């Protein structure tokens, strides 16, 4: 599913972030990191830029479910991912591409986030932002080196904040 980059006022994004963290039972540490630290830094150091909230759920590398969150370049300010309550390892991969996931060779992979325990969660904040030149495709595989898709039910849920 392709989602065009559509930036909006920061307050709307922060409302969505707050709702998502509560609905996914994010830990208090992640809530504080996003809702205080990142929000304050963007407001004071980046001039409160227009942002976009992008959610993903049950990520696999199936072409139907890989969310292409931006078909043009963008800057990622934050990622939150929470693994479903399964024993199967999931490696969330953030790819710098408008159309392709990393695959076995990982040519497009910029970030690999291991989610190895049921309900594992990770919050990552990028200051001054992680620049993605061509777009972002989110994928999940069973190993860090890649190639084997995460199956439905094992993939992580979460969101990104981009600008």
Regions found by a protein language model. Give the residues of each.
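Extracellular "spike/adhesin" assembly and maturation modules
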Residues: 1-32
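Surface-exposed coil/turn segments at beta-strand junctions on protein surfaces, enriched
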Residues: 71-72, 117, 131-133
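Noncatalytic modules at the cell exterior or secretory-pathway interfaces
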Residues: 77-79, 129-147
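Exposed aromatic-hydrophobic patches
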Residues: 120-129
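Short proline/glycine- and polar residue-rich coil/turn motifs
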Residues: 113-120
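Short beta-strand/loop motifs in extracellular/secreted proteins, especially
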Residues: 77, 88-92, 156
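Short, surface-exposed beta-strand/strand-loop-strand elements in extracellular ectodomains
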Residues: 85-107
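C-terminal interaction-tip segments
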Residues: 2-14, 42-72, 84, 141-163
């Amino acid at each position: 599913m392709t989602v065009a980059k559509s930036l909006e006022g920061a307050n709307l994004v922060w409302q969505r972030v707050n709702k998502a963290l509560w609905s996914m039972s994010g830990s208090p540490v992640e809530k504080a990191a996003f809702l205080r630290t990142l929000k304050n830094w963007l407001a004071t150091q980046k001039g409160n830029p227009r942002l976009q909230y992008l959610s993903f759920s049950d990520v696999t590398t199936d072409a139907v479910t890989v969310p292409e969150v931006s078909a043009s370049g963008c800057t990622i300010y934050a990622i939150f991912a929470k693994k479903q309550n399964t024993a199967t390892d999931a490696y969330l991969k953030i790819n710098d591409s408008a159309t392709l996931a990393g695959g076995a060779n990982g040519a497009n992979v910029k970030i690999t986030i291991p989610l190895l325990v049921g309900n594992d969660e990770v919050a990552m904040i990028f200051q001054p932002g992680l620049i993605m030149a061509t777009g972002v495709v989110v994928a999940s595989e069973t190993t860090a080196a890649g190639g084997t898709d995460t199956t439905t039910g094992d993939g992580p849920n979460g969101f990104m904040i981009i600008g």
